[in-house]
Swiss-Prot record:
Gene3D superfamilies: 3.30.190.20, 3.40.50.790. The lineage of its organism: Bacteria, Bacillati, Mycoplasmatota, Mollicutes, Acholeplasmatales. Binds directly to 23S rRNA. The L1 stalk is quite mobile in the ribosome, and is involved in E site tRNA release. It comes from the Bacteria. GO terms for biological process: regulation of translation; translation. Keywords: Repressor, Ribonucleoprotein, Ribosomal protein, RNA-binding, rRNA-binding, Translation regulation, tRNA-binding. GO terms for molecular function: rRNA binding; structural constituent of ribosome; tRNA binding. Part of the 50S ribosomal subunit. InterPro entries: Ribosom_uL1_bac-type (IPR005878), Ribosomal_uL1 (IPR002143), Ribosomal_uL1-like (IPR023674), Ribosomal_uL1/biogenesis (IPR028364), Ribosomal_uL1_3-a/b-sand (IPR016095), Ribosomal_uL1_CS (IPR023673). The gene is rplA. One of its GO terms (cellular component) is large ribosomal subunit. This is Large ribosomal subunit protein uL1. It holds the Pfam family Ribosomal_L1. Belongs to the universal ribosomal protein uL1 family.
Amino acid sequence: MKRGKKYLTSLRIFDVKKTYPLQEAISLAKQTQVAKFDATVECAFHLNLDLKKVDQNLRGALVLPHGTGKVLKVAVLAKGEQAKQAQEAQADYVGDQDLIDKIAKNWFDFDVLVATPEMMPQLSKLGRLLGPKGLMPNPKTGTVTNDVLQAVKEIKNGKIEYRLDKSGNIHTILGKVSFDEAKLLENLKTLYLQLMAVKPRTVKGTYIKSVTISTTMAPGIKIDPVTISQ
């Protein structure tokens, strides 16, 4: 793959073969910004997990202490009092069957979809549309709930979802390059603590194989996992 000049220049800032302490890795990531805009800072945890084992197929959500810097559009499927709560929480779209019908016609002007359990039977028919886009509500991520007020507030305050991919990686957003280093550090440590808290008992050997941090379109910087827990 042909790389741009900025990408190649960023490679001179650090050693791709070296593993860096957390604080230094974050500092280097901010220096390697390739994009002209306020780039997203991303993190990937490579875990020693087997997707074939049900208890090792990690999926969940957490609220980052300093958010992600990204404003998400939230759609809520609810009726009555719960619909009012969604509006109170400043959800971008609130509806029931009317919203489901709209989605069925390929409307996806939202980033997260929240639904009450009552709405799931109707919504489940759209699994083929929502599933591939990662938009299907799920109890594990808190997007199927009766407490829509809390759900919307958490999403607006920087809640992220994480899910193990086929290669054993969990890839998430940590924030923006404009965040100061302390905020990015705390966000990453929060994610680390969450992954440690949900570590399956059946894991054998080293749980976290590697951790990498990068900004949009920039090369990844390896982090020493031991320094994250310090």
